[in-house]
Amino acid sequence: MNGNNNTGNLQQSHGPPQQQQQQQMFNQTPQMGFQQAPPPGMQGRGNNAQTPLQQQRFNMSQQQMMAAQQQQQQQQLQQQNAMAAAAAAAAASGRPVPQRNPNYNGSPNPGQTLPLNNNNNNSNNNNNKTGMYNPNALATGMPSSNLQPTSSAGNSRGHTPRMVNQPQPFIPHQQNQPPLPPQQQQQQQQQQQQPTPQLPPQGQTPQQVQMGYPKKVNNGNLVANQSLKSGPMGGPVPMGGPQQARIPPNSSFQQSPQTQFAMPPNSNGPINPQQQQQQHGPNQNPQPTVSGRSPIQRQMIIATTTATGGKGDTNNSVQEQVQQEINTRIIKRNLGNAAIIRVLDLIEFISNQHYENLSNIEFWTKITPANFLPTAILKFNTTNITGGNGNKSLNDITGLNLNFLNSNKATSNNNNNNTNTNTNNSNNNNKPHQFELTTSTAPRFFASCIQTESILKCNISLSGSKFQVLSNGSIVIVSKIGLHFHYKDGSNSALHGTIKILMSKDLRIEWVDLNFSDYQSNISVSALEEKLKSIITDNTSITKKDIKRQKELLDELVKNSQASKLQLTFGIEPQSLRILQLGDVMSSMKSLMEFSMVNNIPSPMKSMELLIASQKNQQMQAFQAQMAVQAQAQAQAQVQAQAQGQNLANFSGSTNLQTDAQRSRQQQQQQQQQQQQQQQQQSLNTSNNNSNSNNSNNNNNNNSNNNNNNNNNNNGKGGIANGSNNISSPSPRTVNAEEPKRKRKQSVNMSNENKRRK
């Protein structure tokens, strides 16, 4: 080549001529959807990375596209002469041959470098550049300000086209690529249009790889980052393996920051979500895990997984059921806790009130509707308690020793007349007692307990509270309870038992069941101090009488304490217990009071008589109605049994009738057959008799005729007399039923022949 000294002619290594011809043919073929690895001869080039042309077109900005379009228009005029160089290869491949410019003598090979001349004839390194010739490609890369066309004045070849300053990217050759189906081609185009994530090569972190950004400027040329691991031939080894697009080495170009590599399908590189969904199938439901969940959720998840046979994925219905169960459990737990807190708040509210408020009935009547339902019931039950106040009964202590209140009477009488009444009384006193109050009688009992002077302080403690929420929203609370009474004389008593509370949805008490099982009486040291001072003396002055007196004083102290005195009354004053008994009676007479108020009966005795009579009538009516219902049910059962029996009898009778009818029909048929047979036999016999008689008559007639004929013949011929004796007739005894007819016909014929002969 004849060129200027200031122009640098940089040549690249090329393969054999056959490979150059294949490269020239590939440059004229349209670009496919994705790129493959270059031929083996091209792997010996440098490590400069390039991006496919089609991918650069999608990643270019609007200004670059406009500049590229303008330069394309300029290049179309310059490349008309260059199209003649590929005429032979295009004709060999069956493609249309472009028109050749007569002024164009030849063109360089597409794999060779073009010397770019400089008009100023200076040795500036910025102009020492090379360009890759590709007749089917567009000049892309730098903006229009950096695209400076060069002059070909210093070159001996005047036909050399004017090339842009930016070289074109090299597109690797596709060897024997089979045609793909339309669906796969469309999918590949969609994958190229979508941005694909870039992953670092093996052995490098993402911070070390910068594929889409230029690294440095070397003499005016933007060189791509070369941080990829080099392969065995010196070329880059992409992340996707041999099927991934490879970049030809020794090609410097300007790479856009948005440049990305297009991945072919079924590669090991990064794949888009659609490919990932196709490879892994439809999305599966995530398996429920028990980590980071509450104990209830863990239990429900384990139960559902075991119910579904150990499968992690559950149906939507099962998940909804589990969620509903968890929600209901949470609601029930919160509701039960709220009920317990409501009871504790009520106790705290009462304990913080002043004595004046607690001793007033109006205070209790005000707070009762807020915490109890109008139909609420309060029950107090006590077990066997011994000691205190001798052998007195509870009714004797309270003063309500009435016959209808004497419910603790002995149930059985002993046959021995020498039994002691004291033992009976002690047995009656040790029996448990049951009391029941309503919302109208409970406030007076509470106020009377506070108004007693002997009790200084009362403590209530609840421990071990448990709850259960029912299906209708009610809450049952069960807890241990302890009542501690402190008296003026320094003694104290403790009652231990259980309490059951039923609360409604609005957290109001429906009923309370209080059971006391233990009573303990104690004396404090302060109460014993004064007594002990008077008893204790010097050891020298103590005698047997003094010791005996000390014991008696201690016994009197224990017996006279308030805690021991109130043992039979459960630690409360007899007056308060009297009100409790009256409240129990009034609560049991609640129906009587309602009856008297409804019927406007002022007299309680008359209302009681009418109530008892009406209750008896109601009981009788209810009993009669019950008996009528039972009788009706029994009658219906009997009717059903009879109907069933009749159905069975009818069924059996119908079957018997059917069998009898069949039998009678069979007998009738047999009789008819027998009659028909008899009639046939009779008809045969009569026919035989008639035939025999007819045959005999015919034979007689024939004989007579024959005799006459013979006589006539003899007379006419003058023949032998008595010629009829020679003619014999068959005997009727040996003739069958059919033979006489034949012989009769023959006889007739014979008679006719005889007549004709005459």
Swiss-Prot record:
InterPro entries attached to this UniProt entry: LIM-bd/SEUSS, Mediator/Homeobox_domain
Lineage, top ranks: Eukaryota, Fungi, Dikarya, Ascomycota, Saccharomycotina
Described function: Transcriptional regulator with a general role in all morphogenetically distinct forms of filamentous growth, namely invasive growth and biofilm formation. May control FLO11 gene expression as part of a promoter-bound complex with FLO8 and MSS1. Important for virulence.
Record note on quaternary structure: Interacts with FLO8 and MSS11, both morphogenetic transcription factors binding directly to the FLO11 promoter.
Compartments where found: Nucleus
Annotated stretches, region: Disordered: 1-49, 87-293, 408-433, 650-758
Gene knockout outcome: Defective in filamentation and invasive growth in response to environmental cues. Defective in the formation of biofilms. Displays decreased virulence in the greater wax moth Galleria mellonella infection model.
Gene: MFG1
Skewed-composition ranges (Polar residues): 1-10, 100-116, 142-168, 218-229, 249-261, 650-665, 722-734
The protein, known as: Morphogenetic regulator of filamentous growth protein 1
Organism per entry: Candida albicans (strain SC5314 / ATCC MYA-2876) (Yeast)
Keyword Iron on entry: no
Keywords: Nucleus, Transcription, Transcription regulation
Signal peptide limits: none
Recorded GO CC terms: nucleus
An annotated GO BP: filamentous growth
Biased composition (Low complexity): 11-31, 117-128, 183-210, 264-288, 408-430, 666-715
Coiled coil stretches, renumbered: none
Family: Belongs to the MFG1 family.
